């Protein structure tokens, strides 16, 4: 296992991303990358994605979120980076 410290990616995904399987798709990609966290629908129509793991794997997830192969339609993704602040087990849809 790498000695690299874990990071936390918080991504706000804008577009038609609710009711189209986007959170399920995000969870599947995150688990494939070995990340922990969650994807949550927000009342304003966005999806909040919080992922923790290596910087490299979180950057890969961010690239997938910004790519064109997601369910629905992603108009933009706003990402914020920080140190992993808490222990999260698994990756969940909220």
Curated annotation (Swiss-Prot):
Protein name: Acylphosphatase
InterPro entries according to UniProt: Acylphosphatase, Acylphosphatase-like_dom, Acylphosphatase-like_dom_sf, Acylphosphatase_CS
Signal peptide positions on this chain: none
Active site: 23, 41
Any coiled-coil regions, as ranges: none
PROSITE patterns: ACYLPHOSPHATASE_1, ACYLPHOSPHATASE_2, ACYLPHOSPHATASE_3
Hydrolase found in the keyword field: yes
EC number, as in UniProt: 3.6.1.7
A GO term for molecular function: acylphosphatase activity
Family: Belongs to the acylphosphatase family.
Acylphosphatase-like domain segment(s): 8-94
Alphabetic keyword roster: Hydrolase
Claim: Hydrolase is one of the keywords in the record: yes
Species this protein is from: Mycobacterium sp. (strain KMS)
Catalytic activity entry: an acyl phosphate + H2O = a carboxylate + phosphate + H(+)
